[in-house]
Design a protein with these regions (language model features):
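Interfacial loop at the N-terminal end of multi-pass membrane proteins
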Residues: 2-11, 25-66
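Cytoplasmic juxtamembrane regions at transmembrane-helix boundaries
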Residues: 9, 81-104
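Hydrophobic alpha-helical transmembrane segments
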Residues: 58-75, 142-155
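Hydrophobic alpha-helical transmembrane segments of multi-pass integral membrane proteins
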Residues: 20-31, 72-76, 80, 109-121, ...
Length: 174
């Protein structure tokens, strides 16, 4: 049985390739910012409007920690994007329910879990260094949608594993 080709697959392939490059560029930019900010802390504190009366040291340490945790997201994002790319390739070949895709989904779920944990830590650091004089609003912390995505991908990994086993059983009986 032949299946109609989807226009979404080539688009997904190109978008994932672009996102992989952008992810590494993001990592390079954050690394450059960390190096620059720590090389010129007085200029950096002025650039982000830290009031003159505040001790810049805890803010600098906190922001450096946040950026460093942001750098940890780069390889996690890379893992997610490359696994998705391989899955798109298997769908394009008409062979998505294979054990490799179940393993890929499981790896994606673990990476998403790690990203959620990073977000919690980043949110906590942001709240710790924020003050009335230096309000810091980060899009980090607890996310119901993020945690639901983690659960969903773990479940999908199991569905793919079962689908691959059922397919192998079916091929063995035909």
């Amino acid at each position: 049985m032949t299946h109609p080709k989807s226009a979404a697959l080539p688009i997904a392939y190109v978008v994932l390739r672009i996102l992989i490059v952008l992810n590494w560029l993001y990592g390079a930019a954050v690394l450059g910012l960390v190096v620059f900010a720590n090389s010129y802390p007085a200029w950096f504190m002025k650039a982000i409007d830290v009031p003159a009366g505040l001790d810049p040291k805890p803010i600098m340490i906190g922001l450096t920690a946040i950026a460093t945790l942001g750098l940890l997201a780069v390889p996690l994002n890379h893992l997610i994007l490359t696994r998705l790319l391989r899955m798109v390739e298997t769908v394009g070949r008409g062979d998505p329910f294979i054990a490799a895709n179940a393993y890929r989904l499981n790896a994606i779920a673990w990476a998403l879990l790690a990203l959620q944990l990073l977000s919690l830590v980043i949110g906590w650091i942001g709240k710790t260094i924020a003050s009335k004089e230096f309000p810091l609003h980060l899009d980090a912390g607890f996310s119901v949608n993020g945690w639901l995505a983690v659960i969903l991908i773990f479940v999908l990994a199991r569905v793919f594993a079962e689908g691959a086993l059922m397919r192998e059983d079916l091929e063995g009986t035909v």
